[in-house]
A protein has these predicted regions:
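Accessory alpha-helical/coil subdomains and C-terminal extensions
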Residues: 140-213, 218-223, 228-229, 246
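Flexible gly/pro-rich beta->alpha loop and the following alpha-helix that scaffold active-site loops
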Residues: 66-91, 236, 240-247
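Glycine-rich phosphate/diphosphate-binding loop of Rossmann-like nucleotide-binding domains
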Residues: 1-39
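Conserved hydrophobic helix-helix packing surfaces used for dimerization/oligomerization
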Residues: 3-5, 146, 267
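Proline/glycine-rich low-complexity loops and linkers
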Residues: 48-51, 58, 75-171, 313-315
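Short alpha-helical segments enriched in small residues
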Residues: 46, 226-397
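Short beta-strand elements in bilobed, periplasmic/extracellular small-molecule ligand-binding domains
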Residues: 29-42, 290-294, 367
Length: 397
């Protein structure tokens, strides 16, 4: 069974809007036993929408469209699909009345342009949009299911969960794939794949996903026997125990948070280059107050001087150590971490862009780490956070 997504919107192709509907749809389908087969993004141009829709209709059992069913002149997805399938577009008087009452309740008159949202393709079923005024649409055409859904994510996702997934479960069998992950740090993707190929069992479905210093190894637990899978995971641990971040598909900061809770440790942080990004990730997790004692963002030299109550060193390895040791004393945490660095794109120090200095202290010892990272300013900042997390995990272990 093939499922395709047709995303409509020039703003998606221009990069003005990120297509979060694609990722949320893929995740929701997979968690319910289905796989999104393909996705096509098209501009707000009728002929292109029609052409790509008909291509998808030919090769898929289910087509989901998002976008182009609003009240403006560039919203014409329903119109185009009706043209492609030779269907009439009829006014749903009941829905129109409901829309008008919504406007009246706010003391406003509904613009005439909104009437098009109440138009429904001939023979279609209206899907209740609990977050907006444009209803979703379900068409059954030649035993193929066509869902025409709104583009705003807060409207799209509930319709997928409440309307699309239940219908798919009623009419199609779920996939037998069962993915799980192993997360690696400080590994080159090609080298990692080459080494794993030496002991990978025949038939094991693997994929490598690299991002910001972390490589996710995705594997299908159902593609080989349980015994062979267990042997494979043991081999992974034997060969890469020093590089494995997690056996779960979780953010690196979550792995750190879990470890701190497990060990009943508290943490204080001093951030410069990362500007509070590391502590921000940690506080996203419920129960963060039991782990994170304090976080100081010290961006300027003046702020660092004030924190230390002394002059600061031009040597960032020394300075990072001073900041970490001051933090653990000041905040009485089990562990402290400080991170300094040069993010660029124009150097603001004598250090090269991408040079990162991390210090971790636990009252008994302080350990320094020096990393040389590449990429844009945002890449370096993100990778700095991940390196700090990785260094801290290894310090604790």
């Amino acid at each position: 069974m093939n499922i395709a997504l047709l995303s409509v919107g020039t703003e998606l192709l221009l990069g003005d809007t990120i297509n979060t509907n694609l990722s949320s749809l893929g995740q929701t389908l997979y968690s319910n036993g289905f796989i999104l087969s393909s996705e096509v993004t098209v501009p707000d141009k009728k002929e292109i929408i029609k052409t790509e829709f008909l291509k998808l209709l030919k090769n898929n059992d289910v087509i989901i469209t998002c976008g182009g069913i609003g009240p403006t002149e560039d919203d014409f997805t329903k119109e185009v699909i009706c043209d492609a399938l030779d269907l009439d577009l009829n006014l749903d008087e009941e829905h129109l009345s409901w829309m008008q009452s919504r406007w009246e309740a706010r003391g406003l008159s509904m613009p005439e342009t909104n009437i098009k949202q109440a138009q429904m393709p001939e023979g279609s079923k209206k899907l209740n949009n609990t977050q907006g005024t444009a209803p979703g649409v379900l068409l059954n055409h030649s035993d193929k299911y066509i869902f025409i859904l709104p583009g705003p994510p807060r409207e799209f996702k509930p319709l997928i969960i409440d309307e699309v997934v239940p219908l798919l479960k009623e009419n199609f069998s779920t996939t037998k794939k069962n993915y799980d992950f192993v997360l690696f740090f400080n590994q080159a993707e090609s080298s990692l794949a080459e080494e794993i190929d030496k002991f990978k069992p025949k038939g094991l479905d693997l994929a490598y996903l690299a991002s910001k210093g972390i490589i996710k190894l995705r594997y299908d637990k159902n593609s080989i026997s349980e015994d062979k899978l267990k042997e494979f995971l043991n081999d992974l641990n034997d060969n890469f125990s020093d590089s494995i971040l997690s056996y779960e598909n979780i953010p690196a900061s979550r792995a750190l948070f879990n470890l701190l809770k497990e060990k009943k440790l508290t943490l204080s942080i001093v951030e410069s280059i990362t500007g509070g990004n590391l502590s921000s990730e940690i506080v996203n997790y419920p129960g963060a107050s039991s782990v994170l004692v304090a976080a100081n963002t010290l961006y300027s030299n003046e702020a660092k001087k004030e924190f230390l109550a002394s002059d600061i060193s031009d040597d960032w390895e020394v300075l990072s150590q001073q900041l970490a040791e001051k933090s653990i004393t000041k905040h009485n945490s089990s562990i402290s971490l400080s991170i300094l660095g040069e993010a660029g794109p124009v150097p603001s120090s004598n250090y090269k862009i991408g040079e990162i200095f991390i210090a971790i202290s636990n009252n008994e010892k302080t350990v320094n780490f020096h990393h040389k990272l590449r990429g844009s300013r945002s890449d370096i900042i993100d990778r700095s956070v991940n390196n700090a997390v990785w260094d801290l995990i290894n310090f604790i272990k």
